[in-house]
Amino acid sequence: MTMTDPVADMLTRLRNANSAYHDTVSMPYSKLKARIAEILKAEGYIADWSEEPARVGKTLTLSLKFGSNRERSIAGVRRISKPGLRVYAKSTNLPRVFGGLGIAILSTSSGLLTDKQAGKKGVGGEVLAYVW
């Protein structure tokens, strides 16, 4: 069966594994998901990610990050632009997640960027998700 929204599936797997205090979470690999994982690692929300071969295709494995007393580094994840309702933001009207404490992940003409990076480059795009 085909998946209509692979990004939402990735974020749901991440949210569920984080809530259950799992150390890792695996999902089918795609370039878009790998780029989202790179952003999450660069922003400090996950410890690491890896691409592993599977019987069919590849698997993307995320290593989740927890604090000293098993505090979650990800408080919440929300999918914004969906296949049925795309959400776009201009460079002059980029979203701020919790006053700058979280990040918005945007798909721009310059690739996937956070809201801060898109603001510096002066580009807008499709708002994929919020992470805080």
UniProtKB/Swiss-Prot annotation:
One of its GO terms (cellular component) is ribosome. GO terms for molecular function: rRNA binding; structural constituent of ribosome. Keywords: Ribonucleoprotein, Ribosomal protein, RNA-binding, rRNA-binding. Signal peptide: none annotated. HAMAP family: Ribosomal_uS8_B. PANTHER family: 40S RIBOSOMAL PROTEIN S15A. This is Small ribosomal subunit protein uS8. It comes from Kocuria rhizophila (strain ATCC 9341 / DSM 348 / NBRC 103217 / DC2201). The gene is rpsH.
